[in-house]
Amino acid sequence: MIRELEVTDIDEYYMKLLCQLSGKEKEYIWQDMWPFWLRYENNDHHQTFVYEDKGRVIGTASALIEHKFLHYGSSVGHIEDVVVDKHSRLSGVGKGLIEECVEFCKKGKCYKVILDCSKENIPFYESCGFQYSENCMRKDLIDG
């Protein structure tokens, strides 16, 4: 079942799921995450979805809406932090999360939805209706 992230989801399993995306094991403490939750909770232009199976979150993805000066003040949707538990991949979980993010962006009247991904994930996103466009550049500002 896909639904919006709730404060009670941010637990040991959810944080370990995010670690699968970053590739870095880090011990997260709930109290440290509280300021982020408060900032997130009151933002109508950012939504995180989770896929819950048997009471456990096995996938997550976020959608953000950016307002632009271009295109007469319309908006662009961004999809970020897409991850499915390594034991649940290739089961439709990721595709469902992407569809939910795209719907959120449509409701936000976005004229396009964009995302960054690794070369290995291009076929997956193409299967979700995305097409390769341009390049991504990056500059890390914080180590680790």
Where are these regions (language model features)?
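Active-site rim helix/loop that mediates acceptor-substrate recognition in acyltransferases
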Residues: 27-48
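Helix-loop element at the rim of GNAT/NAT acetyltransferase active sites that forms part
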Residues: 15-28
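Conserved beta-strand in the GNAT
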Residues: 50, 56-65, 83
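Conserved GNAT acetyl-CoA-binding A-motif
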Residues: 98, 105-117
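Conserved beta-strand-loop-alpha-helix junction that forms the acyl-donor binding cleft
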Residues: 113-123, 138-142
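A conserved beta-turn-beta hairpin within the catalytic core of GNAT-like acetyltransferases
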Residues: 67-79, 89
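A short beta-loop-alpha structural element at the N-terminal edge
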Residues: 1-14
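Conserved acetyl-CoA-binding loop-helix of GNAT-fold acetyltransferases
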Residues: 84, 90-103
